[in-house]
């Protein structure tokens, strides 16, 4: 059912032509099918984690799952004739339990976010990629820095020196590479950074606004959600180290070959 639902969603959004497309030298269909297999394996793994952590659905939660599954089955029975009602009930229960495991294991996450951590800033940057001679790439940014300090407009310098046309961004903490982030958040509005080395190249960063108004609340929510995700993935990763899931390749091939 997961496979059919995901396939249908993609087809409704992008038309049936997507199945003739290729993505990274692999058919889009194979890409979607493998994604669904990963989703199914993760669902099973999280339910195993629930058992390990002694987390279970209450009687009322199970009854609600059954009612929702039955209602869905009755409404869509012609479209999902390939699945039995009790199998659908089990799938609904597994998904709800997966959500409950997430909530239970992330309940202790620290929800305190400092004013500085919640800041969102608006920046411009000049980027020099790592192709070619590194010293000449860095020298190019040194020239840009000298010209800015001599009074040249930063936007004009972007057009003159940057390897990419995009040069403006609005960022929060934890979104970009640490060296870039540290340099950007240490700037006050109107200041420019030294040359920043990142894994994909070098940057000069100019701060337009060091605290964009109206963004703190959504940024706090984003930071807390990221903390929850990190904590849950730590639990799941520690548990999965001792688990081996065996996929029945013949059954999966049979299922995924169905149109």
Regions found by a protein language model. Give the residues of each.
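Hydrophobic (often cysteine-bearing) scaffold residues that line and stabilize catalytic clefts
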Residues: 29, 33, 37-38, 42, ...
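A generic structural-conservation signal
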Residues: 59-61, 167, 193
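Generic alpha-helical structural signal
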Residues: 63, 138-142
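Peptidyl-prolyl cis-trans isomerase
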Residues: 143-180, 209, 214-215
